[in-house]
């Protein structure tokens, strides 16, 4: 029992560090943006109303929607938009039109994650460093350079992995939550009546008397739920119970105390609106608080970067992105990965965001549209999971998700007002990623259709070949083929140029499925084709690590003896040639051809030994 408790405590501490870093640092800027906008006069009724809106936003969106409802929609224990997309699309596989719509919506939501992934580290680190301006105005000119240096160091460290320092994320973030709670309490004791704002009637009164202002400030209120998606995205790492326990026991109480403390400070000193978070602290504590805030925002940014790597890997394995060079940075933890292209693309985009917007207040204008649209998409997919995967009655599905849909829609509509003030930036990034993902998916479909139409039936081909068999050489040849039962181009080229066949020949097709994990007991299917030839199908989930040589070891004892020293892997390196008048638009075909050209080779992707790989090229028109 004690070991279970210690395991739960460790997972809960880990969840505090990874899952809640982003939402935990929103106290740095959320209240400041609502009152600093000038839309809300400093009256006790308005301050009570805003705090009440904050409290009930956290309660409805995070506590009820994500912690209670969405966490239930796991895909074999995994969470995140891709996992939910796989769950929803599988549930409606007998409705092809609806399935395609859901796939497009889900892919768009996944694309928006990258836009969010640019804004979050930029606004978090920048808002922490801006605390130096409270220490001394002389630091103002150094805020952006210091922010850029911190971000560069963060991204430069990624290739070395974070397993070593990752164990400190939970304790540091826990200290952060304790500190922000104490800061809030220090102000609440000066005006305990501020706690009355927990009552929803203050929020309702404010909205009733200020409908126009309410609509406008929702664009800033949404900042208090930044990172809510992480609760679901990190489900597979920690599990439901630790995530829920961390939220209700530590995170939400600390956030509420801090927000209410900032409200109490503003009641006593409206001038503190320039930076209410830091001005809650005594002067002697400012520099240590800036240091702690910077560490907390770096941890929050790290969680976002790690999430970007994980989402990219899943998208690659589900066929929405080309193969990328994925490096494992930890021997013990297979989830610790590094993708060079994603890392430095994110860094460049974040630097652009910091340099273009120059302050956390300006970045707050860019934040919101992508996040609220993502929340809308999550609610929509949740509806289809409840309806078609859980088979609940339609009325219950509407009741369960309808309120959340309306709340998300209100936040999204409010944030649309920030479109030209900066909201376009994450949308532009998300739109670009969406274009790449859909172009790759459709391009691969066209390419596979072309390969299928030109394919030669493998059993018939082998029968013809062995009428007058070529010379056999020792060892095993592994030919990769997109479709089982078809002759791979690499084999045709090998016979044409080398005029030999190996003693054993494996025709291997790798299948990716819309489930997170497929166990080793279901990894392999093997079928004898005669003449010491076998058709092998290897199955992977979208979170499995790919290692084809390891998977093929299961063949031993099933009629084929595989020795790594005498095994050669024959791959076809196809060059895509765009043509006019078929398939996609011309510019998309050219884009797909370029993506295909730049894709990482199958050898690296499938972890094949470099000294055993033979690549043979061919051209394919689409």
From Swiss-Prot:
User: What subcellular compartments does it reside in?
Assistant: Cell inner membrane
- Catalyzed reactions per annotation: K(+)(in) + H(+)(in) = K(+)(out) + H(+)(out)
**So which domain of life are we looking at?**
Bacteria
How does this protein lie in the membrane?
Multi-pass membrane protein
Under the cellular component aspect of Gene Ontology, which terms does the record hold?
plasma membrane
Any one Pfam family here would be K_trans_C
Q: What residues form the membrane-spanning segments?
A: 8-28, 50-70, 101-121, 137-157, 169-189, 203-223, 247-267, 279-299, 337-357, 366-386, 393-413, 419-439
Q: Which InterPro entries match?
A: K+_transporter, K_trans_C, K_trans_N, Kup
UniProt keywords, alphabetically? Cell inner membrane, Cell membrane, Ion transport, Membrane, Potassium, Potassium transport, Symport, Transmembrane, Transmembrane helix, Transport
- Name which cysteines form disulfide bonds: none
Which is one GO molecular function term here? potassium ion transmembrane transporter activity
The entry assigns this protein to a family as follows: Belongs to the HAK/KUP transporter (TC 2.A.72) family.
What is the role of this chain? Answer: Transport of potassium into the cell. Likely operates as a K(+):H(+) symporter.
Q: What is this protein called?
A: Probable potassium transport system protein Kup 2
Its source organism is Polaromonas sp. (strain JS666 / ATCC BAA-500)
């Amino acid at each position: 029992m004690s070991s279970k408790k210690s395991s739960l405590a460790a997972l809960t501490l880990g969840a505090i560090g990874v899952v809640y870093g982003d939402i935990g640092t929103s106290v740095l800027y959320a209240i400041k943006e609502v009152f600093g906008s000038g839309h809300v006069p400093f009256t006790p009724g308005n301050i009570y109303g805003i705090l009440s809106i904050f409290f009930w936003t956290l309660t409805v969106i995070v506590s009820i929607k994500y912690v209670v409802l969405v966490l239930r929609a796991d895909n074999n224990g995994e969470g995140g938009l891709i996992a939910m997309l796989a769950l929803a699309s599988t549930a409606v596989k007998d409705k092809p039109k609806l399935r395609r719509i859901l796939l497009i919506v889900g892919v768009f939501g996944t694309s928006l994650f990258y836009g969010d992934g640019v804004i979050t580290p930029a606004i978090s680190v920048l808002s922490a460093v801006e605390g130096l301006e409270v220490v001394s105005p002389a630091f103002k000119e150094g805020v952006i350079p210091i922010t850029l240096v911190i971000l560069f160091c963060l991204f430069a460290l990624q290739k070395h992995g974070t397993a070593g320092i990752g164990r400190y994320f939970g304790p540091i973030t826990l200290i952060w939550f304790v500190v922000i709670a104490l800061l809030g309490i220090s102000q609440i004791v000066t005006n305990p009546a501020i706690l009355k704002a927990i009552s929803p009637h203050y929020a309702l009164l404010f909205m009733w008397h200020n409908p126009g202002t309410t609509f406008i400030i929702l664009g800033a209120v949404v900042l208090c739920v930044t990172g809510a998606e992480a609760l679901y995205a990190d489900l597979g790492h920690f599990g439901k119970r630790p995530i829920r326990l961390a939220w209700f026991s530590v995170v939400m109480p600390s956030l509420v105390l801090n927000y209410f403390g900032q409200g109490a400070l503003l009641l006593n000193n409206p001038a503190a609106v320039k930076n209410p978070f830091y001005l809650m602290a005594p002067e002697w504590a400012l520099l240590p608080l800036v240091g702690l805030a910077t560490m907390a925002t770096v941890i929050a940014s790290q969680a976002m970067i790690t999430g970007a790597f994980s989402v990219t890997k899943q998208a690659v394995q589900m066929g929405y992105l080309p193969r990328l060079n994925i490096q494992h940075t930890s021997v013990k933890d297979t989830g610790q990965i590094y993708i060079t292209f994603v890392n430095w693309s994110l860094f460049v985009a974040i630097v652009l965001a910091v340099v273009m917007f120059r302050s956390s207040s300006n970045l707050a204008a860019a934040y919101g549209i992508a996040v609220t649209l993502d929340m809308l998409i999550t609610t929509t997919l949740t509806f289809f999971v409840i309806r078609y995967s859980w088979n609940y009655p339609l009325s219950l599905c509407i009741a369960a998700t309808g309120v959340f849909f309306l709340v998300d829609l209100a936040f999204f509509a409010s944030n649309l007002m920030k479109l030209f003030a900066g909201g376009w930036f994450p949308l532009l990034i998300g739109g670009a990623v969406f274009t790449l993902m859909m172009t790759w998916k459709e391009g691969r479909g066209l390419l596979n259709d072309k390969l299928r139409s030109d394919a030669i039936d493998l059993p018939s081909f082998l029968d013809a070949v062995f009428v007058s068999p070529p010379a056999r050489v020792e060892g095993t040849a592994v030919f990769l083929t997109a479709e089982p039962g078809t002759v791979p181009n690499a084999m045709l080229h090998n016979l044409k140029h080398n005029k030999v066949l190996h003693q054993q020949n494996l025709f291997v097709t790798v299948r990716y499925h819309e489930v997170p994990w497929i166990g080793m007991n279901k990894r392999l299917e093997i079928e004898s084709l005669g003449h010491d030839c076998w058709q092998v199908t290897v199955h992977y989930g979208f979170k499995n690590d790919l290692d084809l040589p390891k998977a093929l070891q299961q063949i031993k004892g099933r009629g084929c003896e595989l020795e790594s020293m005498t095994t050669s892997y024959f791959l076809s390196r196809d060059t895509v040639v765009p043509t006019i008048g078929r398939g996609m638009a011309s510019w998309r075909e050219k884009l797909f051809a370029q993506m295909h050209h730049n894709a990482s080779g199958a050898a690296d992707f499938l972890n094949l030994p470099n000294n055993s790989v033979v690549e043979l090229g061919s051209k394919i028109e689409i």
